[in-house]
Amino acid sequence: MPESLMVIRSSSTLRKHWEWMTFSADSVSSVHTLTDDLPLESLADQPGAGNVHLLIPPEGLLYRSLTLPNAKYKLTAQTLQWLAEETLPDNTQDWHWTVVDKQNESVEVIGIQSEKLSRYLERLHTAGLNVTRVLPDGCYLPWEVDSWTLVNQQTSWLIRSAAHAFNELDEHWLQHLAAQFPPENMLCYGVVPHGVAAANPLIQHPEIPSLSLYSADIAFQRYDMLHGIFRKQKTVSKSGKWLARLAVSCLVLAILSFVGSRSIALWHTLKIEDQLQQQQQETWQRYFPQIKRTHNFRFYFKQQLAQQYPEAVPLLYHLQTLLLEHPELQLMEANYSQKQKSLTLKMSAKSEANIDRFCELTQSWLPMEKTEKDPVSGVWTVRNSGK
């Protein structure tokens, strides 16, 4: 290892504290917890403060499997945004995407809101820490095909359920996930919760801090979100700055000359582009009046990307977050089928208005509707047909 390294693990909704540890050529520190007496700024004097790997909790990330038009399709920040746009819970936000795997026309990506990533980087920069890599928390957990890896964190469980799928759930939601999608194999650090089991015998290890599984010898480069507009610029010398300014000045003069000689042709081109854009929009409105779109009409006509039905882990996270915010609702039973595109919940509530409010709050990510109430138990059935 060429230099000291510090790994910082951000807090999450279920785990309120930050953690950190350091690596050097001849030693590895234990896992430490930040407190009011030991804030983030106190790490600026520690070894590795100039080479920080930041771990972001899975709750702030999106995982998507995308299909390209063809194997040679050029992937850029813009084309990734187009491909993922129909699957976003809120397409008004600007998302930053990282390709973690590509097999022919199939692409696995991880997304984070650009504003959120900027806040993370600004916070560590203000604390005097130099971030050189940003990774999803959980990417360092050991994993094998058709298996889960679980780490007990006292208040929650850190989970790696697939090659590029990481999440953090409390015990209640972990039990729901395991009941609906039991894995073939399971590796567990800590005592496995009651009702969580795999098809094959459990591989059990003593409980340890999840961060202690991080390895400084593994690059984790495929998961690094510090790229594109977030990539750090190298320092430029004074002579380099002067040459850069000269080059920019020459380029500006060349552009002005080109614009001056081609202004009429450019004006006609822009006018034609506006006409074509308006024609495409009119055609889109004629065929798809219920879907509002303002750009990239040809791409969506060709691909006709439909809203994907949510995968189990992010769906459970949405439900978990919603129920934590509304204690007047209690989940009694959940039945989920991604194949049949259906979700059925049995819920109890203080009043029917609480159930109506729950259905209203789910409209942005998975519309739910109440169907019936058990006259004896008072339990409501809420479902989504997936159609």
From Swiss-Prot:
What is known about its induction?
A: Silenced by the DNA-binding protein H-NS under standard growth conditions.
Transmembrane stretches in the record are 242-260
Q: Name one GO cellular component term.
A: Gram-negative-bacterium-type cell wall
Keyword Membrane annotated: yes
Q: Which Pfam families match?
A: GspL_C (PF12693), T2SSL (PF05134)
Q: Subcellular location, in the record's words?
A: Cell inner membrane
Gene3D superfamilies under this entry? 3.30.420.370, 3.30.420.380
Instruction: Tell me where on the tree of life, at the top rank, the source sits.
Output: Bacteria
What membrane topology was assigned to this protein in its record?
Answer: Single-pass membrane protein
User: Looking at the keywords, is Transmembrane helix present?
Assistant: yes
Q: Which UniProt keywords apply?
A: Cell inner membrane, Cell membrane, Membrane, Protein transport, Transmembrane, Transmembrane helix, Transport
Q: Name one GO biological process term.
A: protein secretion by the type II secretion system
Q: Which SUPFAM superfamilies match?
A: Actin-like ATPase domain
Task: Give the record's family classification.
Answer: Belongs to the GSP L family.
Q: What additional remark is attached to this entry? A: Part of a cryptic operon that encodes proteins involved in type II secretion machinery in other organisms, but is not expressed in strain K12.
**What function does the entry list?**
Inner membrane component of the type II secretion system required for the energy-dependent secretion of extracellular factors such as proteases and toxins from the periplasm. Plays a role in the complex assembly and recruits GspM resulting in a stable complex in the inner membrane. Provides thus a link between the energy-providing GspE protein in the cytoplasm and the rest of the T2SS machinery.
Tell me the subunit arrangement: Type II secretion system is composed of four main components: the outer membrane complex, the inner membrane complex, the cytoplasmic secretion ATPase and the periplasm-spanning pseudopilus. Forms homodimers. Interacts with GspM. Interacts with GspE and GspF.
- Protein name per the record: Putative type II secretion system protein L
